[in-house]
Swiss-Prot record:
Source organism superkingdom: Bacteria
Name of protein: O-antigen chain mannosyltransferase RfbU
SUPFAM superfamilies listed in its UniProt record: UDP-Glycosyltransferase/glycogen phosphorylase
One Pfam family from the record: Glyco_transf_4
Biological role: Mannosyltransferase involved in the biosynthesis of the repeat unit of the lipopolysaccharide (LPS) O-antigen region. Catalyzes the addition of a mannose to the rhamnosyl-galactosyl-undecaprenyl diphosphate intermediate.
GO molecular function ontology, one term from the record: glycosyltransferase activity
EC numbers for this chain: 2.4.1.378
UniProt-listed InterPro entries: Glyco_trans_1, Glyco_trans_4-like_N
Pathway listed: Bacterial outer membrane biogenesis; LPS O-antigen biosynthesis
Protein family membership: Belongs to the glycosyltransferase group 1 family. Glycosyltransferase 4 subfamily.
Alphabetic keyword roster: Glycosyltransferase, Lipopolysaccharide biosynthesis, Transferase
UniProt KW Glycosyltransferase keyword: yes
Keyword Cytoplasm attributed: no
């Protein structure tokens, strides 16, 4: 089997974490003949003992939206297809992102969400999710996704048989995180680099939090992040809000462990790793009242209507009513351990024979 990680961006991101854990689980169950990856990641995978096929760094993803990169990938992917066919023939190929390699029929892609179908970040993304991805989903041998909510959305939106779609949940290792009982007076927002993350809804409802708490926003250097910074200035919150970029995992663990709560009011999500990571850090989470969070977090989270000030007020007040035991969220986090992911990878291999 070939694993296509050619569009995988920088290490440490949610996509990177999912891909590495997926690869680890797959390797314990099946033979992995080679990894397709960007040159910048080649050394990492070679040290793990994988045979590597490299692609130029320019085709991998970054935290910045690029109008050029998808076009470069589209052209380059045909050359990559020929390389793969010549070297590996019709071997099974799986990609942990939604990007296909043309001409290859025996491949599986991973569609983490179809949010861009409804809320695209660019015109190219809109065209891709509404037309090109639809064709890819129909052509591919199988499709993976990260929640049953997204599975249903893919089947309905692209009119494909749900039996062609398998779910493999994200994995979080509780021991990677720091559990603290004592919390500091700041809310934390993680991954707030794009408009659908909707952290502006929390900022603009400043009356419910800014008198008693601060806000730390971990995000990329994107247009949306710049708009948030301007909003903070306009609302006279500069002394209450801190923006952090390029945060390491070790730094993020500390932020999680000390936060009074994570706020994650997304309009749409495929799964949502930060709320699980926050729970692994004994930190309460406030999330938007959308179906995927009810699937993933069940009754472990506090739910809000992000546009309703009273809803935010109620959620923040309810944090005080939560159990204070340091193990209060362990049962929710345990649903997403590595063994569960490995079992779901095994189920996919059985379903897609």
């Amino acid at each position: 089997m070939i694993v296509n990680l050619s569009r995988l961006g920088k290490s440490g991101t949610g996509m990177w974490q999912y891909s590495i854990k997926f690869l680890t689980a797959l390797r314990e169950i099946a033979d992995v003949d080679a990894i397709i990856c960007s040159k910048v990641h080649a050394d990492y995978f070679e040290k793990l003992g994988y045979a590597v096929v490299t692609v130029p760094n320019i085709v991998s993803n970054t935290s910045k939206t690029s109008r050029l990169r998808p076009l470069v990938w589209y052209v380059y992917s045909y050359w990559l297809a020929l390389r793969v066919l010549i070297k590996f023939g019709n071997k099974k190929l799986v990609c942990t992102t939604h990007h296909t390699i043309p001409l290859l029929r025996n491949q599986t892609i991973t569609v983490h969400d179809i949010r861009p179908f409804y809320y695209p970040d660019s015109f190219i993304q809109k065209v891709y999710f509404r037309f090109l991805l639809k064709m890819s989903v129909k052509r591919c041998k199988h499709v993976l996704t990260v929640s049953y909510t997204v599975k249903d959305s893919i089947a309905k939106t692209y009119n494909v048989d749900s039996e062609k779609i398998s779910v493999i949940y994200n994995s979080v290792n509780k021991s990677d995180f720091i559990q603290k009982k004592e919390k500091e007076n700041y809310f934390l927002a993680v991954g707030a680099s794009w408009p659908h993350k909707n952290i502006h809804s929390f900022i603009k409802n400043k009356k419910v939090w800014s008198d008693s708490y601060n806000l730390i926003i971990v995000c990329g250097r994107t247009d949306y992040a710049m708009s948030l910074q301007q909003m903070v200035v306009d609302l006279e919150l500069k002394d209450k809000v801190t923006f952090l970029h390029e945060v390491s995992f070790n730094e993020l663990k500390i932020l999680y462990s000390k936060a009074y709560a994570l706020v994650y009011p997304s309009i749409d999500e495929g799964f949502g790793i930060p709320p699980i990571e926050a729970m692994a850090s004994n930190t309460p989470v406030i999330v938007s009242d959308i179906p995927v969070f009810h699937e993933v977090l069940t009754n472990g989270a506090l739910y809000v209507n992000p546009d309703d000030e009273k809803s935010w007020q109620s959620a923040i007040k309810n944090i005080e009513q939560l159990p204070d035991a340091i193990s209060r969220f362990n049962n929710y986090v345990a649903r997403y351990d590595f063994d569960n992911m490995k079992q779901m990878v095994g189920n996919w291999l059985a379903e897609s024979k």
